[in-house]
UniProtKB/Swiss-Prot annotation:
Part of the 30S ribosomal subunit. Forms a tight complex with proteins S10 and S14. Residues 38-106 form the KH type-2 domain. GO terms for cellular component: cytosolic small ribosomal subunit. Binds the lower part of the 30S subunit head. Binds mRNA in the 70S ribosome, positioning it for translation. GO terms for biological process: translation. Belongs to the universal ribosomal protein uS3 family. CDD domains: KH-II_30S_S3. This is Small ribosomal subunit protein uS3. GO terms for molecular function: mRNA binding; rRNA binding; structural constituent of ribosome. PANTHER family: 30S/40S RIBOSOMAL PROTEIN S3 (PTHR11760), SMALL RIBOSOMAL SUBUNIT PROTEIN US3C (PTHR11760:SF19). Keywords: Ribonucleoprotein, Ribosomal protein, RNA-binding, rRNA-binding.
Length: 210
């Protein structure tokens, strides 16, 4: 059976870059765990803000965090009050100086992670999975995606037996390394159990090094 590799990891160093940009030797494991802690904290704290991606850069005792979000206003807060609170909480968590940079995601319909989370939210609101998938596919294509594939796995529609259903429109070339493919996954916590959602969005071809 053919298994699908994570399309972002597969393209690292070709057309995609790393989300953690730092170098360490002896304390590599400690910093890696710190990264995981920061990501988990931000995801939980800012779930309603539509977090697409978190990039972490380190230099000496300073940590710079780039947060890609669909709703920057919610994170910044009134006169930047919310972002200052988050900075303090992260400083307490890591005992390091934290710098936060917020970057707006202009087209959330073309961001795989945000699309996956949106489908998960709809499933939690008891919207039929086929309808939720179709709606996301249509809006992604409308905003300029060359292709999109959404997969839902679990007890769909409350069925006794879990299954996997997917829906694809356009091209999604997984083997072409120059293909700019965005990948995101989310979980919908329904009364019947967890439903996993995976989203692949093909945005066109990029020449390596550009």
């Amino acid at each position: 059976m053919g298994q699908k590799v994570n399309p972002i990891g597969f393209r690292l160093g070709v057309i995609k870059s790393w989300d953690s940009k730092w170098y360490a030797e002896a304390d590599y494991a400690k910093l890696l765990h710190e990264d995981l802690k920061i990501r988990a904290f931000l995801k939980k704290r800012l779930y309603s803000s539509g977090i697409s991606k978190i990039e972490i850069e380190r230099a000496a005792n300073k940590t710079k965090i780039n947060i890609y979000t669909a709703r920057p206003g919610l994170i910044i807060g009134k006169k930047g009050s919310e972002v200052e609170t988050i900075k303090k909480e992260l400083s307490n968590l890591t005992s390091k100086e934290i710098f936060i940079n917020i970057i707006e995601v202009r087209k959330p319909e073309l961001d795989a992670q945000l699309v996956a989370e949106n489908v998960a939210l709809q499933l939690e609101r008891r919207i039929a999975f086929r309808r939720a998938m179709k709606k996301s596919v249509t809006s992604a294509l409308k905003f300029g995606a060359k292709g999109i594939r959404i997969t839902c796995s679990g007890r769909l529609g409350g069925a006794e037996m879990s299954r996997t259903e997917w829906y694809r429109e356009g091209r999604v070339p997984l083997h072409t390394l120059r293909a700019d493919i965005d990948y995101g996954c989310a979980e919908a916590k329904t009364t019947y159990g967890l439903i996993g959602i995976k989203v692949l969005i093909f945005k066109g071809e990029v020449l390596p090094g550009h």
